[in-house]
Amino acid sequence: MKDFYQYFQFLFFFMLSVISFSLFVALTPLSNVFVFFVFNLLGQILLNVFSFLSFYLIVYPIVNWYAYKKHIFTKRFIFNWNYTVILFFTLIFLIKINSNVEKSYFIKIFLINFGIVLGNFFIFTLLILEFVVWIYLNYVFFKDVNFILDTFKFLEFKIKILFENILSYFPFSNSLDVKKDIKVYGDSVDDLKDSQVFDEKKNIINDEEYQALWSFSAFLRNNKKPSNINLDKTIFEGSDLKEASSLNKDILNENALNLDENVDEIDESCEYKYLDNLEDNKLVISGKVKACEIRTKGIISQVAISHVYNENVALNKKNDSYVIDISVFDQKEIKNDVEDIEYDKEIQKQSMILQETLKEFNINAKLIDIIKGPVVTMYAVRPDKGIKLSKITSISDNIALRLAAIRVRIIAPIPGREAVGIEIPNKRREFILISEIIDSKEFRGDFRIPFALGKEISGENIVFDLVNSPHLLIAGATGAGKSVCVNSLIASIIFSKSPDEVKLIMIDPKIVELKLFNDIPHLLTPVITDVKRALEALRWCLDEMERRYVLLDNLLVRDISSYNKKIKDENLNLMILPYLVIIIDEFADLILSARKDLENLISRLAAMARAVGIHLVLATQRPSVDVITGVIKANFPSRISFMVASSMDSRIILGSSGAEKLLGKGDMLYISSLNPFPXRIQGGFLKEREVYRLVEEVKKFGSPNYIDDEIFIDSVKEPDLVALGPSDEPMFDEALEIVKTTRKASASYLQRRLKIGYNRAARIIEIMEDMGYVGPVNGSKPREVLI
């Protein structure tokens, strides 16, 4: 429709030009010579032109209304174009008045005939008034007075395009030899200067090639193909123009992007550009770009993707004995190409409305990049010099109103770029499955405790190592995706790491959230739901931390990685220390019940436990200052914030606002010690049935060895029974028989079986150890039964 509108306008001006030329010839002294040819040979043409003109005047308002309604052009463009039509009609009226005189000499009649003089005066006055009104309306509505120069430049550009198209039909001319000078703006001053123009023909591309390359880079980015393209700072050589049948398919088959086998059947009336031989090798993948309708479609179609690496059977891990099939997770369905085309049209429409809105508030800015994400699309704009960033951020609600968006988030500026980012929610939201991140090359990296977080706005999979965090704080309102994020963290760990590599302690005051993971071999204790038991578990972790520090000191190493490496390299007769992750799902319920004890335990663990491989993950839905205290924030540099109610809550979590503008359902902001600027990420969605399948698979690798029974003291107090030996303990023989039968030497186990107090059961175990029936305490391992 966009091309039709342009041709419609061109036809109208062509008709007016023919009429103007004919009337002008009739007014000149040469009319005696040309009058016969003009009114006889062109008579039929003019008759047809006037006939069509009457039809045009009827259709003209409808076409303009449709162009505005569908956002084919901006309001400013349509307004100025149509105002030009009004001026053209005025000029035609001027010539028509003078053409009524029968004499041939224009000046003579102009001086004699008073009516003609009065008519000319009226028309000239009307022209001046129209120009004044034109300038005034552009200043009032669009805050722009340079539109006349822009209009002339645009007309000059379209005339060049017209002549190139005309010359391309002649065999002795090639339209691609006529190259246009385009302005290339660089992000770095060292590379390119603003408004710098390159005149060398080999370094200049025309407008169609630029649009094709821009779309091609977007196509590569959306389909996860390697590319390092920045059209704002890269100059490409001219591309060759070839027919579809003359493409060398052997060359294309060597690349990651291949043509469809039925490429010859695709729209043979359209020319294709074959992109290769690009300067600096910035684009090393060749492809076939559809040159016609590149602006309306906005994507490169008819390019088939060859999946080079697709592994659906199993994920290889360092521990070959611990392998879990990726099929336990739901797999993503194939995208619909029709939806992608509609999505690209929607993006073009939004970009035009966004630029109009900025103009309405007298903000001159250039749209330099569009980054399409699964949930939001970020429009990167470069404001003119002297524009305050606060002026842009203050109109976020107006932008949301014009675009009918739920929330609009503005990043002013984008870190590392000379631009402001405006994030607008997509009309059609794309859900990210956890399998997309786990079954990616990013997840196959060398991670000690991997966490498949999600996808950022550019489509890149985000996976980070919890060891480098070293602790993680997760906060967000109810239903924003916090619990799913915690489940994704646990799923990432137990999917990729064996129980010998990572151990887990889960504390769930809400009782129902983490119960699904009970009985997996990674657990050191069943999922804890009681506050007192949670405190005892954290005290045990503190003792375990001190024990590990003693082990590290004995080997003269600084951290757990060096400790395990030294054991392997020197074949020492010592046990490898597994990493320990403590996950607390609802931290607010715990800290409000036992603030002093819990805060001291958390602070000590967060400050000292990272070196010995103990890491904390705290999640809460109440981001208040009495829950997330300054001491906790200081020891948790890595934080995730989902949607919150207010900017105050966002500042408590992240230290800055922005989380209140999130959309929920996994939409998050993530900061870390390596990247303190909040990065927007869409979290992976994990269904409950996927958790069930994963847990059942993990249980096949063994049962849990709960050693935490000894750390929980029974709340029922009874008088201490001091026993010096087996003869002094009447229940010793029964306890020894239980240990011999069950092969479990645990004080809390005897406590439950014999229904006695913890102190008494612990004393019985000590007597067994002294007599050589059971082994000593062996760290996180259960006691060895020697009988």
UniProtKB/Swiss-Prot annotation:
Gene Ontology terms: biological process: cell division; chromosome segregation
Any one cellular-component term (Gene Ontology): plasma membrane
Domain of life of the source: Bacteria
InterPro entries registered for this protein in UniProt: FtsK/SpoIIIE/SftA (IPR050206), FtsK_alpha (IPR041027), FtsK_dom (IPR002543), Ftsk_gamma (IPR018541), P-loop_NTPase (IPR027417), WH-like_DNA-bd_sf (IPR036388), WH_DNA-bd_sf (IPR036390)
Location relative to the cell: Cell inner membrane
Domain notes: Consists of an N-terminal domain, which is sufficient for the localization to the septal ring and is required for cell division, followed by a linker domain, and a C-terminal domain, which forms the translocation motor involved in chromosome segregation. The C-terminal domain can be further subdivided into alpha, beta and gamma subdomains. The alpha and beta subdomains form the DNA pump, and the gamma subdomain is a regulatory subdomain.
Protein name in the entry: DNA translocase FtsK
